[in-house]
Amino acid sequence: AEDGATHYTYEDDSFETISTRIAKVVMFICFWGFIFSITGYIVFSNLKRYDFGPEGKKITKDAPYFRDIPSNKDLYRAYFVANEYKILKNKNDIAGAIILKWIKDGVISVRQETKGKILKKEESVLTIIDENPKITNKNEQKLFDLLCKQSILEADGNKTVDNKKLKKWCEDHYERVFSWFDSVLKEEKDKLIEEGLLIKKKATFLKIFKYDIYEFSQELREDAVQIAGLKRFLLDYTLIKEREAIEVHLFEEYLIFAQMLGIAKKVAKQFSELYPDLVEQSCFYSYDNFYFVNAYAYN
C-alpha cells in the first residue's frame, strides 16, 4: 500500500537558517524603529509649544509708545517675552544687558588701563568691585563666576577681567556659551510657570499623542506690547516732538533694555547728540564705556 504513496519528510531548520531569520526580523524592527523615531522627532519638534491666545504671537510694529520700563523692570521676564514674541534682534544681546546692569548695581565698573611695554595704549577693562553680589538668578551667577575666574589681580589691587583669557575660554567652550542663553530662557520659563503667568495645558497630536503646551497669560501679552512700544519709542526718540526730559535712573534703564533689544548703538548715538552730559551723571560715566560693553558682549 505504501508503494504508490508520496512521502513527506520534515527536516529541522539549521541553526544558521534560524539565526538569519532572527537577524532579518531584528533589522526590520530596528529600521522601522529608527524611521518612526526620526519622524516623531521632526513632528514633535515642530508642534506648537505655546498658545498665544486669539491675538497670536505677532505684535504690530506700530505698537503705541511706551515710556516706562516694561515687565515690572524685570530684565529676564522681558527677555523671555521678547524672545517668544520675536521682538528681539538677537537673543545673545542679553549678556551685554546683564553687564550694564552690574555696572548700575555697582558690581563691576569699566576703567581705562595702560597696556603694552613699548607701544603703550589705553584699553578699557572690566573691574570687579563686589566679588560677592546678591544674585538670585542662577545663570546670571554662572556668568559672574566665569568673569571672576577669567580675571587677574593687578599690581594696584584691582581685579580686572583678562579680555584675551576670557575670549579664548569662550572660543574653546562655544557650545557651553551658546547653551547658556537657552538656560537663561528655560530658567525664566520655569519661573513664569510657577507664578501662573504661563499656564500648562495638555494638547493632543493625531488624537493619540499627548504633550504639554503653555498658554501665555494676558499679562504677558501686555508685556509684549509694552516691550514693542518701548523699542519703537527709543528708536523714534529724536522724531518725537513732545519729549520730556529724562531722569538719570530712567536713562540708565533705557540703555540696559536697549542693549537687550539689540538697538543699543542707535539709541546711544541719539542720546549722545541730545544729552551729551547726561551720561556723565549716570553709572556709565561716558558713552565710550557703553560702546565698550556693547562690543564686549559680542567678542
Question: Whereabouts are the PLM-identified features?
Answer:
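Acidic, Ser/Thr/Pro-rich intrinsically disordered cytosolic tails and loops
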Residues: 1-299
